[in-house]
Every structure is written in C-alpha cells, then in structure tokens.
Amino acid sequence: MGLPADSGAAIRGRPVIEGEAVRAGGGSGGVAPGDPCPHRPAVIDCLVTHHPHLPRDRMGHRMSRSGRSLIVEAVRAVHGLDVTARDLVRDVHKRWSVPAYGLTVSVAHCDAYSAVALSAGARVGVDLQDERDRPYAMRWLGELLGRTEPATIGDFAECEALIKASHVTKETFAGVRLPAWQPGWRATNVPPYRVRSAHLGRNMHLALVADRSAPVRWWWRAGRAARATRTDALTLEAA
C-alpha cells in the first residue's frame, strides 16, 4: 500500500487449515491445459517458500526474486505444469493469471520468504509482512481504517492482499473496513471479497483474500531445490 516505513502490535492466531497432512507436491493440483472450469468448486493452493541465500544490496537489505519467477516455480511445484513467464498475464488491476490453465495467481515476498496463492475457481490475493518498528505507518493505517487505535502488521497484510485480489487501489482504499480477526474467512465491506490471516512463527504474517470462501491447501518448501509438501500445520517457526 506504500505505507510510510515505520510498526504495529502483532495479530495473534493460527490458520484454520483444511485438507490432509503432509503430502509431496508436483502435479496433485489437477489443473489441465485449457481448463478454466469457472463453475467447479474453488480451491486455493498457497505455497510458502524459504529463500535462505538471497543476496543483499549495498545497504544490507535482502534482495527478492522477481514475482514472475516465483509464480512460475509455484505453478510447477504445486501443479506440475511446465509454464514459463510468457504464460503469465496481468490485467488492468495488475492481477496475475495463467489463462491457459484457468489459474488466478497472487505473489508476495518478505525477507527470506515468499508466498504464492493459486486458484482455478477464485480470484485471490496474498501478502506477507514481518514485524518491524513503524508506529507512524500503523497509526496512519488505523485512521484510514476508521479506528481510534493503530493498525497491526496483520491488518497491513490483509489490506495489501485485498488490493491484490480486487479492483480496490491504493488511491481508492479510503472507506475500506476490515472485520475483527477470527479464524477462517471473514467478509469485508468490499463485496464479494473475504479475508483470512495467520501469525506464522514469531514475526511473520500471511494474509489471503478471495472473492468467495474456499478451502485452502497449504504447501511448504524449505528452499528452491526442495519439493513442495502439503501440510495442515503451516508454520515458519522451524524454518
């Protein structure tokens, strides 16, 4: 959202995870070429990847990989599809998709982690934020959300995910209100979009937004060379 760079209190809670326990990735998503299937039940696959050896810039900040490359890797890891950057499209709202496979996509990266959300039935947005000291930014966001108290980093992640999934922009965000946190999907005042979020580990927040409630299949990769594994207990604490 382009907030001024300075924190907020942590959101608490864990995701309500649907689905099975750990399973190896690579093609289990079941998406076929030219298969948009707009009427089939929506399922969201969310892959979190650890990137432990990213280079740093002159200021010591960790440099992130491109969104396109992260999406390509996620589609391959989760669905086993041999896509390239040329298969990716962005619409007028800067939302990613893979039209040949009917996938909508969103990508986020923060510090040494990335998250990619994929769905063949729902419009999705994902965001990652870490805990940093930025009280001015959180007070500003709290006021924008119509609150008397500062926003949290979890709120920040939810706002960013909503912008990525919807027609809302940073310039038209005034008037958006987030529902009080609870496990699972919650309706926003930007219909039909719904939001869910989790505090992952000690200082990382993940938010998902979709245009409908849908089961979430969580995936984890310990590195680029690792296989994606299904998990019903997504956490970054052991990473």
Where are these regions (language model features)?
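Core catalytic alpha/beta fold that binds nucleotide/phospho-ligands
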Residues: G2-A239
